């Protein structure tokens, strides 16, 4: 069997890892052995936080809706219950956006909810 020299593949692999580690501080960005570990850890964090991001944004939307609803005399849970009873199917992301950027539209939704809760 012929001898296999791995200079080309090794260099390519090193270049790929170091490119992924670009911007890392210190030896994490320019020493292959350390950069490889840093890139693996960064990938783990990225995987974990793509899932965490969904939870964090949902919490943010609920906090914004709650604050806006309380200004108009309802708690978040009362507001959510009223939305369900009034058959208003707007998701939390859109409600939070309305609460921040279009107070009048959010206020009209709250009035519909209050009317439905009073019945």
UniProtKB/Swiss-Prot annotation:
Its Gene Ontology cellular component terms are: ribonucleoprotein complex; ribosome
PANTHER family for this protein: 39S RIBOSOMAL PROTEIN L20
**UniProt keyword Iron present:** no
Q: Which GO terms describe its molecular function?
A: rRNA binding; structural constituent of ribosome
| InterPro entries per UniProt | Ribosomal_bL20 (IPR005813), RIBOSOMAL_L20_CS (IPR049946), Ribosomal_protein_bL20_C (IPR035566)
- Name of the molecule in the record: Large ribosomal subunit protein bL20
**Main function:** Binds directly to 23S ribosomal RNA and is necessary for the in vitro assembly process of the 50S ribosomal subunit. It is not involved in the protein synthesizing functions of that subunit.
Keywords associated with the record: Ribonucleoprotein, Ribosomal protein, RNA-binding, rRNA-binding
Q: Which organism is it from?
A: Verminephrobacter eiseniae (strain EF01-2)
Q: Which GO terms describe its biological process?
A: ribosomal large subunit assembly; translation
């Amino acid at each position: 069997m012929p001898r296999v020299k791995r200079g080309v593949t090794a260099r390519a692999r090193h270049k790929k890892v170091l490119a992924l580690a670009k911007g890392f501080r210190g030896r994490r960005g320019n020493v292959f052995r350390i950069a490889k570990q840093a890139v693996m850890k960064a990938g783990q964090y990225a995987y974990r936080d793509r899932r965490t991001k969904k939870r964090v944004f949902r919490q943010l939307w609920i906090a914004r809706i709650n604050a806006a609803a309380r200004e108009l005399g309802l708690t978040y849970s009362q507001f959510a219950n009223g939305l369900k009873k009034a058959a208003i199917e707007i998701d939390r992301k859109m409600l939070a956006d309305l609460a921040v950027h279009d107070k009048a539209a959010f206020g009209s939704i709250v009035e519909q909810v209050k009317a439905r809760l009073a019945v």
